[in-house]
Each structure stands twice: as C-alpha cells, then as structure tokens.
C-alpha cells in the first residue's frame, strides 16, 4: 500500500492519458519484451504526431498505426483515442473480443497489429529522439 501511495505521489505531475492509450501500452507489454516507453520517441512517427518518411520497419509500425486511427475516424462516432475495447492477452497472443461494436473492434485491431509489429521489428537505438533532426522533415 505504501508503494502505491508513493507511486501516486510521483505521478502527480503526469497529465491524465486517454484510457485507450493504457490499453495500447498493455498490449505492447503483452506482445513484447521491450517496455512501451521505448516507443514514445522513436523515429519520426512513434509518439504523438509524426512527419516525413518512416526511418525503418519499427517507425513504419507507428506510421501504419497512425493511419489506422485516421481510418477509424471514418466509422460513425468513432474516436480511436478515447474508445475502449475488450481484449485478452495470453502472452504473447492478443485477441480482440468486441464483435458487435464496429469502432471498438477496429481500434482494437489497430492496437493489436501495432503491438505485434513492434515485437517483430528491430529496434535501432540511433533512431531514438531524432524528430528534431532533418530525418523527419
């Protein structure tokens, strides 16, 4: 209990995240041995936004995920950033469970595909924190 309280105090300066982001992070942990923060500032597309040409296969995973979320917005009333869904994780297998909610199923598939892609793609440490360089213009 003390550890939980201390961790909550340390998190006081962290802005709240959409619930879907937590689901994506958990999927990444399910499919992968690398932790999700490794992907927050990777390449030109991993993290918030993106521009330029993806620098490698892992960055292409993020580029594809961004476009998948854009496609989800074409489903009536679907906001992929806030949409939550049901899935199961039996490491490293992820199964999306929402069969009737088209938006939830689509967003879950976007996140599932990204998590699997991250697990398969090589991680090149020289592509971390490169957005401020000319590589992403």
UniProtKB/Swiss-Prot annotation:
Q: Which cellular compartments is it found in?
A: Secreted
The residues that the entry says bind Ca(2+) are 45, 47, 49, 66
**Signal peptide stretch:** 1-11
All disulfide bonds of the chain are 30-89, 44-136, 46-62, 61-117, 68-110, 78-103, 96-108
One GO term (biological process): lipid catabolic process
> Which transformation does this protein catalyse, written as a reaction?
a 1,2-diacyl-sn-glycero-3-phosphocholine + H2O = a 1-acyl-sn-glycero-3-phosphocholine + a fatty acid + H(+)
> Where expressed (tissue)?
Expressed by the venom gland.
Return the similarity comment: Belongs to the phospholipase A2 family. Group I subfamily. D49 sub-subfamily.
In its UniProt entry, what is this protein called? Acidic phospholipase A2 1
To which species is this protein native?
Bungarus caeruleus (Indian krait)
């Amino acid at each position: 209990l003390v550890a939980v309280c201390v961790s909550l105090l340390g998190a006081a300066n962290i802005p709240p995240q959409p619930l879907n982001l937590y689901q994506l992070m958990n999927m990444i942990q399910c499919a992968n041995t690398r932790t999700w923060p490794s992907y927050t500032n990777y390449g030109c597309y991993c993290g918030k936004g993106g521009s330029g040409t993806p620098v490698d296969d892992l960055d292409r995973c993020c580029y594809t995920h961004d476009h998948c979320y854009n496609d989800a917005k074409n489903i009536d009333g679907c906001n992929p950033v806030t949409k939550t869904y049901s899935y199961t994780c039996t490491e490293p297998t992820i199964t999306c469970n929402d069969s009737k909610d088209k938006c939830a199923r689509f967003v879950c598939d976007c996140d599932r595909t990204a998590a699997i892609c991250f697990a398969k793609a090589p991680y090149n440490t020289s592509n971390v924190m490169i957005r401020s360089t000319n590589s992403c213009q």
